[in-house]
Amino acid sequence: MTKYKYLRLGLKKRIRYLKHNRRNKDYIVFLHGFMSDLEGKKPKTFLNFAKKNDLGFLALEYSGHGKSSGKFINGNISKWTKETSLFIKKNVKTNRIILIGSSMGAWISLNQFKFFKKQIKGFLGIGSAPEFLENLMWKKFSRKIKLEIIK
């Protein structure tokens, strides 16, 4: 059975996560995709891989995803990137990191290079969907909204 934990960020915010602690070892940090969570096969597969290979493991549900607090509509890539960097800093400390990002999680993983450049040992993007923002959102925006965003 997978045991999930919660990290409090502020008075009302809780982030659900999975962690396999390994001091002085490299950590796999798995970042899920858009509107996803930690219930799928990918995070559990990478957790099992980490355990079998004596690696640390960390995965979180961004705010508004899964059982983490918050509303999905109040989130965005910048917010989830910041949450992720704070979360990694608090949990991984100075250990080296292997980032694995699925779909939007690959984008958020790439953003982590700004914060952990010297700690990142590797990166794997799975179905990184570089066009997902265009297909999911941009094409649905009115001309007025598009012009406002471009300003």
Cite the ranges covered by each PLM segment.
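N-terminal cap/lid segment of alpha/beta-hydrolase-fold proteins
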Residues: 1-23
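Short beta-strand element of the alpha/beta-hydrolase
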Residues: 25-33
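Short substrate-entry loop that stabilizes the transition state in hydrolases
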Residues: 35-41
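Conserved alpha/beta-hydrolase
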Residues: 43, 47-69
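Catalytic nucleophile-loop/oxyanion-hole region of alpha/beta-hydrolase
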Residues: 65-91
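Short beta-strand immediately N-terminal to the catalytic nucleophile in serine-hydrolase-like folds
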Residues: 99-101, 126
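Gly/Ala-rich beta-loop-alpha elbow adjacent to hydrolase catalytic centers
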Residues: 101-109
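The alpha/beta-hydrolase serine catalytic core
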Residues: 107, 119-151
